[in-house]
Amino acid sequence: NVSEFRCKCGQNHDTIINPELPEKLEQLYKKLNCSKIIINSGYRCTNHDKAVGGSGSGHHVYGNAADIVCYDQSGNRISSKKVSCAAQDIGFGGIANIDSSYTATHVDVRTSNFWRGDEVRTSSYSVTDDFYKYYGISRTDIQSKKTKNIILTIDDITYTGVLTEK
């Protein structure tokens, strides 16, 4: 659905989306076992990109980028530290934490000049080539855990719930 990627400027103009971006976002969704991914900013027209602090010629302007928040199956935000690690595994070209609470992540599908950022520290250069080392996260920490909805009846009382793989 392209509406999720529309520019937030309020103007009615075409939305440009690199088809690789939603494909990789779907991979990220599956890898993290998300309940949802909210796209806070996808495509941006040049004026809006500049208005929100961009250069006016960055990856959002070309439909290559999204600023996202991922949610787990319980509805909790997934740390951008974990999202960054998973995005690295999937092969996003640009990845960065973009807020001080570590809940929002920039991802893009650039094919050169890779960027691994943490805008809490700096927005102008890469801080690492490996988010696992940078954030001190084990690869097993971000593997999606399988969940299963269950219905159980005991003594004519029905219980419903979710089982999560350990």
Regions found by a protein language model. Give the residues of each.
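Active-site acidic/histidine clusters and adjacent loop/turn architecture
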Residues: N1-K36
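Amphipathic alpha-helical interface surfaces
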Residues: L21-K24, H48, N64, S79, ...
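Surface-exposed patches in mature extracellular/periplasmic domains of secreted proteins
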Residues: C34-G42, G93-D99
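A broad, low-specificity signal marking well-ordered, structured residues that form hydrophobic/aromatic
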Residues: I37, A66, T105
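Short, surface-exposed glycine/acidic/tryptophan-bearing loops
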Residues: N40-D67
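Catalytic cores and adjacent binding grooves of peptidoglycan-active enzymes
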Residues: S57, Y62, C70-T153
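Short, compositionally biased P/S/T/A/G/V-rich stretches that sit at domain boundaries
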Residues: I151-E165
